Amino acid sequence: MSNDIISNMITSIRNAILSKTKTVDILATTTTRSIAKILLQEGFIDGLRERQENGRRLLLLTLHYERKNKSKITTSLRRISKPGLRVYSNHQEIPKVLGGIGIVILSTSKGIMVDREARHKKIGGEIICYVS
């Protein structure tokens, strides 16, 4: 494992989606918890639980592959800002994913949030990833 926890999280979710696995374990940190809560609120995952195993806190994400009640199916997760190349944007230049169907997750001075919320609050920040 590398030191980039966000990339590890995105890769784990992407691999679980490709193998049609129902659940995926991710190391629980403040950042991964915030991103997972956003994915849950936006309807890209079904469930989120925290558990402890061998002294490590883990997040158990429940994925879904069928549309239920206007929920979204995660087809693409892409890490944008990386430790070697940070990508920042002001609130006017935050990109739209699939014309607004997907979301952009940003790290701002007010915490981690989605693109719509950042535009509304007129806050820019570091673009963490695209989800569609």
UniProtKB/Swiss-Prot annotation:
One of its GO terms (biological process) is translation. Pfam families: Ribosomal_S8. Keywords: Chloroplast, Plastid, Ribonucleoprotein, Ribosomal protein, RNA-binding, rRNA-binding. GO terms for cellular component: chloroplast; ribonucleoprotein complex; ribosome. It is found in: Plastid, Chloroplast. The keyword rRNA-binding applies. SUPFAM superfamilies: Ribosomal protein S8. PROSITE patterns: RIBOSOMAL_S8. PANTHER family: 40S RIBOSOMAL PROTEIN S15A (PTHR11758). Belongs to the universal ribosomal protein uS8 family. Part of the 30S ribosomal subunit. This is Small ribosomal subunit protein uS8c. It comes from Spirogyra maxima (Green alga). The lineage of its organism: Eukaryota, Viridiplantae, Streptophyta, Zygnematophyceae, Zygnematophycidae. The gene is rps8.
